[in-house]
């Protein structure tokens, strides 16, 4: 594959890399000649990886352990890991889908990145219209630590099932990415938030079930091209 994006030799970290979009991202980066570190709950089986590191992104201590084995300089970070909420509780879903990315950014990426580096969060169309929900998002997005984020989340009047944590996390992710694009942009670090519609990954069946069928899901999310 021709390296139009200049990834040759770049140190890249990809979360959620054992399947779906994360796996596809890691494969492409390896093909482009990047030094790829795959971080996921299951082993990432790609020839040419620099390392495959096991990590449950919903747990702070496992993130700390994973980053202890990652390089002191990172050129590109791809936060792809996510849970739908159909098989996990509210807090676990939210921590994997939002808190982990915020913690990694604040605790590690700001210290291991510099001018010319980039951060890409893979969210979804569930994060659209986040601007309309700032009042409920602000305290969570602006919480100073992992523990403070959980405390702020716990104070919200939420009685919805765990799959709503997916939606709320994606809205928070959209707001956080927009704010960090401005803040980290001052240091020359580029921040993007990718928001695909329905995509053929392992979680698609879970989303179809929660939405009430394939057509209902497509009507709600659209299709990623």
Report residues per predicted region.
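Conserved glycine-rich cofactor-binding loop
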Residues: 11, 18-19
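N-terminal Rossmann NAD(P)H-binding glycine-rich loop of SDR-like oxidoreductase domains
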Residues: 18, 25-27
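Catalytic Tyr-x(3-8)-Lys segment
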Residues: 158-159, 163, 211-225
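Conserved Rossmann-fold cofactor-binding substructure of NAD(P)-dependent oxidoreductases
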Residues: 58-73
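Rossmann-fold cofactor-recognition segment
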Residues: 48-61
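Short, flexible catalytic-loop segment of classical short-chain dehydrogenase/reductase
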Residues: 128, 195-206, 210, 215-216
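Catalytic loop of short-chain dehydrogenase/reductase
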Residues: 85-87, 117-186, 198
């Amino acid at each position: 594959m021709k390296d139009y994006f200049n990834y040759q030799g770049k140190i890249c970290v990809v979360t959620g890399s054992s399947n779906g979009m994360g796996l596809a991202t890691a494969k492409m980066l390896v093909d482009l000649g990047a030094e790829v570190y795959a971080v996921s709950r299951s082993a990432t089986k790609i020839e040419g990886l620099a390392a495959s590191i096991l990590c449950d992104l919903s747990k702070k201590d496992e993130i700390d352990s994973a980053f202890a084995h990652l390089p002191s300089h990172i050129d590109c970070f791809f936060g792809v890991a996510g849970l739908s909420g159909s098989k996990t509780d509210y807090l676990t879903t939210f921590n994997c889908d939002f808190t982990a990315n915020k913690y990694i950014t604040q605790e590690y990426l700001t210290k291991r990145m510099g001018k010319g580096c980039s951060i890409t969060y893979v969210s979804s169309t569930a994060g659209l219209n986040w601007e309309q929900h700032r009042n409920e998002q602000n305290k969570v997005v602006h919480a100073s630590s992992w523990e403070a984020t959980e405390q702020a989340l716990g104070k919200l009047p939420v009685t919805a099932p765990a799959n709503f944590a997916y939606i709320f996390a994606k809205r928070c992710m959209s707001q956080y990415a927009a704010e960090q694009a401005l803040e980290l942009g001052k240091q020359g670090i580029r921040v993007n938030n990718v928001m695909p519609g329905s995509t053929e990954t392992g979680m698609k069946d879970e989303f179809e079930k929660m939405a009430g069928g394939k057509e209902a899901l497509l009507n709600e999310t659209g299709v990623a091209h």
